[in-house]
Amino acid sequence: GPMYLRFTRDAIPQIYDEDAEFVIGKANQLKEGKDVAIIANGDTVRLALDAAKELEAKGITARVLDMHTVKPLDTEAVTACINEIGKVITVEDHNILNGLGSAVCEVAAEMGKGVVKRIGVQDQYGQSAPYERLLAMNGITVENIVKTAEELQ
């Protein structure tokens, strides 16, 4: 079926072992937590994991999911985050409209509960800059994830 791949020019840290398995439509839970869920994909997964470490030092535990497949979305994993935690942050290096954040918001809306905060590119024209600078310009940072999680507590 249809698919797309996105690549950055910069080298990114390796999160998975070479023998890691991925199932289309099934998120990979990388960390357990009970205070907030952080759902990310692509390179932003490393930011989510780094934010979870910082949050843990502040007494806030974060469940981190790598939602490597946006369509089909792992609605079971999203539903579990909303039912068990109720507070979700999505992180993506993509427009917050019609991406991971929107898909998670649709699940929460159908359920009629939960709070979802989206971190990503706002609905604006893109800019040109080095990758890390673009992330910072759009608030896609460890600091912003931590701040957002703290505001949800």
Where are each of the predicted segments found?
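Amphipathic alpha-helical interface segments
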Residues: 1
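Divalent-metal (often Zn2+) His-rich catalytic cores of metallo-beta-lactamase-fold enzymes
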Residues: 5
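Thiamine diphosphate
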Residues: 8-153
